[in-house]
Amino acid sequence: MFEGPRRYRRPRTRFLSKQLTALRELLEKTMHPSLATMGKLASKLQLDLSVVKIWFKNQRAKWKRQQRQQMQTRPSLGPANQTTSVKKEETPSAITTANIRPVSPGISDANDHDLREPSGIKNPGGASASARVSSWDSQSYDIEQICLGASNPPWASTLFEIDEFVKIYDLPGEDDTSSLNQYLFPVCLEYDQLQSSV
């Protein structure tokens, strides 16, 4: 076989504890730091920008993999009224991140595209994940249970038709729509008053 010139492979980077601490602190704030932020951090830590970029890329991949594993190891959902507790998982490695969740992109800052994270990073000292993170896990589980649990909402099983509901809740005097003008903006209300005086 013909082998072309071997591509240069960068040796594995070994981070100092102070470098890892600084990288994790930034990861706690955002999983997607701006290029300028990563450049400042790289020069401060005396690392190449490419090393910092790859570190964040690897942490995001690790986080996604952990999320997938958590979704696969969750117990199958039973009836909607049955509740089960979600146990906290702890990772033995001091370098890994655990229980970080991105906020929806609509909430993120449009200028630097940062996604805010709770402070749930494992520290080398063995600090435990914050209570906010564990409450998020249980909230997301509850939401899944609500969405996947009961397929028929309680009101869907009533014997009444929509027309009957309209008759039941129709109050006398609601045919006059001018009473709804109080809910409009003042500008619209003034326009409506001008139209009625003409």
UniProtKB/Swiss-Prot annotation:
Residues 65-133 are annotated as: Disordered. Residues 110-119 have a biased composition (Basic and acidic residues). GO terms for molecular function: DNA-binding transcription factor activity, RNA polymerase II-specific; RNA polymerase II cis-regulatory region sequence-specific DNA binding. SUPFAM superfamilies: Homeodomain-like. Keywords: DNA-binding, Homeobox, Nucleus. Its main location: nucleus. It comes from the Eukaryota. It is found in: Nucleus. The record marks I54, K57, A61 as: Required for binding to the 5'-TAATCC-3' sequence. Residues 79-190 are annotated as: LEUTX region. One of its GO terms (biological process) is regulation of transcription by RNA polymerase II. Gene3D superfamilies: Homeodomain-like. A motif (9aaTAD) lies at residues 125-136, 153-161, 163-171, 178-186. GO terms for cellular component: chromatin; nucleoplasm; nucleus. Belongs to the paired homeobox family. The 9aaTAD motif is a conserved putative nine amino acid transactivation motifs in C-terminus of the LEUTX region. This is Paired-like homeodomain transcription factor LEUTX. The lineage of its organism: Eukaryota, Metazoa, Chordata, Craniata, Vertebrata.
